[in-house]
């Protein structure tokens, strides 16, 4: 299995023995050094021998790659400024091309809680929905993020996060996790009505 991460959040990946390669793309070399020094728990995965760090722009790194990755994890910052390119339809299309036939992309989706963030939230879903045959949004409580209520996106060429979910297969692996459970997996995709309405409106207008 080959994984690509934009950002430095790799701490959970090494527990999966089937992962062969992890490419981490982070243009800011100093940021990586600071994370490893002051946030060792968050950055501990960077020391895994399967991890390869590339200090360059994620869009430029992926452009031209075809069918190389099983999963792409986009842990970018907010959709403006120097990272704005990682929230464009072009970028999501490039991710689609870089994934294998059954590839998955997960990414931070912001929050619809505040009115000023709603337009970015809708725009992101619209672009991914147009780029992937399967596109779902899930939620988590992240106290360090604005409002504490944060959304993430799941996009795939083949697998649906609920219809293809096999809880028995997960339990049989006996992996020790700090946060994830099969019940949490199912619950994360159960969204509040106002969020469902926002997503459905974008899908109807762009279906």
List PLM regions with ranges.
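Conserved beta-strand signature within the Rossmann-like core of class I S-adenosyl-L-methionine
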Residues: 102-109
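The AdoMet/dcAdoMet-binding core of the Class I SAM-like
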Residues: 12-102, 115-121
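SAM/dcSAM-binding transferase cores
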Residues: 150-207
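Short acidic/glycine-enriched loop/turn segments that link adjacent beta-strands
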Residues: 146-148
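Conserved Class I S-adenosyl-L-methionine
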Residues: 92-93, 118-139, 153
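Short "lid" loop at the C-terminus of a central beta-strand within the Rossmann-like core
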Residues: 78-79, 110-114, 142-144
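Single conserved hydrophobic/aromatic residue that forms the stacking wall/gate
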Residues: 1-11
């Amino acid at each position: 299995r080959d994984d690509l991460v934009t950002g430095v959040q790799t701490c959970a990946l090494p527990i999966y023995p089937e992962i062969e390669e992890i490419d981490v793309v982070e243009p800011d070399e100093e940021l990586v050094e600071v994370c490893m020094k002051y946030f060792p728990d968050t950055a501990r995965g960077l020391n895994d021998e399967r991890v390869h760090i590339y200090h360059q722009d994620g869009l430029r790194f992926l452009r031209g790659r075809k069918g190389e990755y099983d999963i792409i994890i986009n842990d970018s910052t907010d959709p403006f400024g120097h990272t704005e390119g990682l929230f464009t339809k072009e970028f999501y299309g490039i991710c689609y091309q870089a994934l294998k036939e059954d590839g998955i992309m997960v990414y931070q989706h912001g929050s619809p809680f505040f009115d000023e963030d709603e337009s970015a939230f809708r725009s992101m879903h619209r672009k991914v929905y147009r780029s992937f045959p399967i596109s779902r949004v899930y939620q988590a409580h992240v106290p360090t993020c604005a409002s504490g209520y944060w959304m993430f996106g799941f996009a795939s060429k083949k697998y649906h996060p609920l219809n293809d979910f096999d809880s028995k297969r997960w339990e049989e692996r006996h992996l020790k996790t700090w946060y994830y459970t099969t019940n949490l997996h199912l619950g994360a995709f159960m969204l509040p009505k106002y969020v469902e309405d926002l997503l459905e409106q974008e899908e109807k207008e762009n279906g």
